[in-house]
UniProtKB/Swiss-Prot annotation:
Belongs to the FBPase class 1 family. It comes from the Bacteria. This is Fructose-1,6-bisphosphatase class 1. Homotetramer. Gene3D superfamilies: 3.40.190.80, Fructose-1,6-Bisphosphatase, subunit A, domain 1. Mg(2+) 1 binds at residues 91, 113, 115. It catalyses: beta-D-fructose 1,6-bisphosphate + H2O = beta-D-fructose 6-phosphate + phosphate. InterPro entries: FBPase_C_dom (IPR044015), FBPase_class-1 (IPR000146), FBPase_N (IPR033391), FBPtase (IPR028343). Its cofactor is Mg(2+).
C-alpha cells in the first residue's frame, strides 16, 4: 500500500461531504512547511549557532532562547504572504502581527507557540511547535484586524496541531475529524501519514505534573496526586508512575499515544494568576486535540474550550488527558467548592 502524504490527506478531507475549505487546506500545508524548516534548525543545534539565550525577554517575562526567536520569524515569514490569513499572534510577541499590505488578506487567524519546552533545547530533549487556527470575523475584510478578533473560545477552532522535534519529527493534526499523525520523511521531504484517528488509551496509570510545586497546589490537586502516590495501599489500589519533561508537547504526545493525565494547575505562588500555561497558544490547541482523541480538557472546574478569553496572553490551569482521570480531578474540585459553600 502506498504511503499517504499530508497533501494527499488534506485533499481527501477537502473532497468529503463536510469539505475542508481550500484556503484552510493550503494554510495547514504552509504551517507544516514552516515546521519542517524549524525542524532543520533544531537538528543543526550548536553547529548552526541555534543554542543559547538572548538578552531579551518575551511578553511573558521569560528570557528568550535563540531558537524561540528564529522559529517565530520562520512562522511569520512562511505564513504572511499566502493570502490565507487575516493576522497572526505568537506567544513571543506582545501584540498581533498584521498581514503586510503588499499581500492579500484571507479569512483565518493563526496563533502559535513557536518553540514549546524551550528550556530543553540546550540539553537536547524534545521540543515542539503548537498552532491553532480560528476563523476571522466576517467584517475584517473591510477593516484592520484587532486583538479582540482573536478572543474566541477554543471550541471555535477549525484546526489545531503541533510538531514535535524528537528522535523523529512528527506532526499531530486535527481539522475536526479526528487526530492524525504524520512523520517527516527527510529523504522525500514530505510529511507521511503514520497513524490515523488516534484515541487516548484508557486505564494507563501515569501522570505528568511538576512535583516540585506540590506544596503550592490547591487541595483537590494535592488529594489526587496523594492518592496516586499511595499506590496499591491507597484508595486507588494501583501503582502510578510520574512522567515530566517540562515540554507540554512531549508530555501530551505521550498521553495521546499511551494514556494518562497531564496537569499544570493553579498554585499559590501567584494566587491572582489562573495558571502558568497560555490559553490561546497552548491550552486551547492541545485541548482541541485531546478532545478529538476522546479525552477531556479542563482547568479544574471548567471545560477549557468553553473559556471566553479576555486577553491574548491569558493564562489558565490545565488538567487534560484520559476522560476518567480528568473527571476524577474535576470531581475533587467540585467537592472542595461544595465544602467551602457549606462551611
Amino acid at each position: 500500500m502506498s504511503q499517504r502524504t499530508l497533501t494527499q490527506f488534506l485533499i481527501e478531507q477537502q473532497r468529503k461531504e463536510a469539505a475542508l475549505p481550500a484556503q484552510l487546506r493550503l494554510l495547514v500545508e504552509i504551517v507544516a512547511r514552516a515546521c519542517k524548516t524549524i525542524s532543520h534548525c533544531v537538528n543543526k543545534g550548536a553547529l548552526g549557532g541555534m543554542l543559547g539565550n538572548l538578552t531579551s525577554e518575551n511578553v511573558q517575562g521569560e528570557v528568550q532562547k535563540k531558537l524561540d526567536v528564529i522559529a517565530n520569524e520562520k512562522l511569520l515569514e512562511a505564513n504572511e504572504w499566502g493570502g490565507h490569513l487575516a493576522a497572526m499572534a505568537s506567544e513571543e510577541m506582545e501584540t498581533i502581527h498584521l498581514i503586510p499590505n503588499r499581500y492579500p488578506k484571507g479569512e483565518y487567524l493563526l496563533l502559535f507557540d513557536p518553540i514549546d519546552g524551550s528550556s530543553n533545547i540546550d540539553v537536547d530533549l524534545s521540543v515542539g511547535t503548537i498552532f491553532s487556527v480560528l476563523t476571522a470575523p466576517e467584517d475584517v475584510s473591510g477593516r484592520a484586524v484587532t486583538e479582540a478578533d482573536f478572543l474566541q473560545p477554543g471550541r471555535k477552532q477549525v484546526a489545531a496541531g503541533y510538531a514535535i522535534y524528537g528522535p523523529q519529527t512528527l506532526l499531530i493534526l486535527s481539522v475536526g475529524t479526528g487526530v492524525y499523525e504524520f512523520a517527516l520523511d527527510r529523504e522525500m521531504g514530505s510529511w507521511v501519514l503514520t497513524n490515523e484517528r488516534i484515541r487516548i488509551p484508557s486505564g494507563n496509570r501515569e501522570f505528568a505534573i511538576n512535583m516540585s510545586n506540590m506544596r503550592h497546589w490547591a487541595p483537590p490537586v494535592r488529594r489526587y496526586i496523594d492518592e496516586c502516590l499511595a499506590g496499591t495501599t491507597g484508595p486507588r489500589e494501583a501503582n502510578f508512575n510520574m512522567r515530566w519533561t517540562a515540554s507540554m508537547v512531549a508530555d501530551i504526545h505521550r498521553i495521546l499515544k499511551r494514556g494518562g493525565i497531564f496537569m499544570y494547575p493553579w498554585d499559590a505562588r501567584e494566587p491572582d494568576r489562573a495558571g502558568k500555561l497560555r490559553l490561546m497558544y497552548e491550552a486551547n490547541p492541545m485541548g482541541f486535540l485531546i478532545e478529538q482523541a476522546g479525552g477531556m480538557a479542563f482547568d479544574g472546574n471548567h471545560r477549557i474550550l468553553d473559556i471566553e478569553p479576555k486577553a491574548l496572553h491569558q493564562r489558565v490551569g490545565v488538567v487534560m488527558g484520559d476522560r476518567d482521570e480528568v473527571k476524577r480531578v474535576v470531581q475533587y474540585h467540585h467537592d472542595a467548592n461544595l465544602a467551602k459553600q457549606t462551611a
